[in-house]
A protein has these predicted regions:
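Short, hydrophobic/amphipathic alpha-helical patches that form generic packing surfaces
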Residues: 167-174
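Intrinsically disordered, low-complexity boundary segments flanking structured domains
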Residues: 166-167, 221
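An N-terminal alpha-helical hairpin/helix-loop-helix interaction module that forms a charged
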Residues: 2-160, 176-221
Length: 221
């Protein structure tokens, strides 16, 4: 099996479109899910873009100029990062205390987590493990190490919320240039289709090798 190669990419709404070449064929992916396949790169890209565009226009009939597009698909995430940087700077969060309510507001500011995860986070960030979790997340952002990931797991596990989306959310907002938000299903689907080892190495438990594999997938895609 040849190495998968991304030869073209674009954004359409919140969707990330990629044209990937592997084993002499071309695959059109929308957020890691295969939507088109063929032997001609231009045809596959056109089909992928047309299909994704039709779904996008279902929700935003006037395209990128539709009322509500910016607030729903872009601005609220940028606003969450600005608010995080203003209320809990990375350096202060790594060693400070009392950031629980501020961090809870950041989690509530986007739809990147499930309602169940957000509900459990309220117990985490208003309970005795709040400082432990925030400090561990900040330290993991600064230094991707097993000890910091384990510290996050220990703070989240009593509330049944040691999930990849929760653990990677703050690092992604603090340092989007070096960290990735892990959404297991989409990431596994994409890695399977492009032949990356992440699909076979993935496990639900927070594990440093899994996260390092994710970063490798992002770098090579």
């Amino acid at each position: 099996m040849s190495k998968a190669e991304t030869i073209r990419s674009a954004k359409l709404g919140k969707k990330e479109l990629r044209l990937v070449r592997m084993n002499g064929r071309y695959f059109g992916l929308a957020d890691g899910v295969k939507c088109a396949e063929g032997e001609n790169a231009d045809d596959v890209w056109r089909q992928l873009h047309d299909d994704a565009g039709e779904r996008f226009l279902t929700f935003f009939p006037n395209g990128f100029h539709s009322d509500g597009y910016a607030s729903q698909e872009r601005d609220y995430k940028l606003a969450a990062k600005v608010k995080l940087d203003d209320t809990a700077t990375l350096e202060k969060a790594a060693n400070g205390t009392g950031f629980g309510e501020a961090i809870l507001a950041i989690f509530r500011a986007t739809n990147m987590l499930s309602p169940f995860e957000k509900t459990r986070l309220q117990d985490v960030l208003r309970g005795p493990h709040a400082d432990d979790f925030v400090q561990a997340a900040a330290r993991f952002t600064l230094d991707v190490s097993n000890s910091h990931l384990l510290a996050m797991e220990q703070a989240l596990k009593p509330h049944d919320n040691a999930k990849w989306t929760v653990a990677t959310y703050l690092p992604y907002l603090w340092r989007p240039d070096t960290h990735m938000l892990r959404k297991p299903k989409a990431t596994k689907d994409f890695s399977t289709r492009v032949g990356h080892r992440f699909a076979s190495e993935y496990e639900a438990r927070l594990s440093l090798p899994v996260y390092e594999s994710l970063l490798d997938l992002a770098e090579k895609s």
